[in-house]
Curated annotation (Swiss-Prot):
GO terms classed as biological process: translation
Protein name according to UniProt: Large ribosomal subunit protein uL14
Family to which this protein belongs: Belongs to the universal ribosomal protein uL14 family.
Lineage: superkingdom: Bacteria
Length: 122
């Protein structure tokens, strides 16, 4: 469950390390974002010579949350940290690699590229 001011790890090699949510997209008063939702983020920490620089604003898709996601069979998938993947204007990932597992809930037409790059799909 991500809201404004939440900080997330970046799960791709775009150059950003930590980002902060500045807006949850999808409705005028939408408060929370979960796995698979798109948010606007500001880069708070970046590596030198990366594509993303500190202070840049990007769209991002949430790929892991501490809150987790409930499956139809009743099971819950939770993670230790919140994480997101930075997206360009076409909602394609900026990085060419994805770090860590992602959930099966990302398997929509929009995010199949992220699922195919991920080392593990839970």
């Amino acid at each position: 469950m991500i809201q404004m001011q939440s900080t997330l790890d970046v799960a791709c090699n775009s150059g950003a390390r930590r980002v902060q949510c500045i807006k949850v997209l999808g409705g005028s008063h939408r408060r929370y974002a979960g796995i698979g939702d798109i948010i606007k983020v500001s880069v708070k920490e970046a590596i030198p010579r990366g594509k993303a620089k500190k202070g840049d604003v990007y769209s991002a898709v949430v790929v892991r949350t501490k809150k987790g996601v409930r499956r139809p069979d009743g099971s819950v998938i939770r993670f230790d940290r919140n994480a997101a993947v930075l997206l360009n204007a076409n909602n394609a990932p900026i990085g060419t690699r994805i770090f860590g597992p992602v959930t099966r809930e990302l398997r929509t037409e929009q995010f199949m590229k992220i699922v195919s790059l991920a080392p593990e799909v839970l």
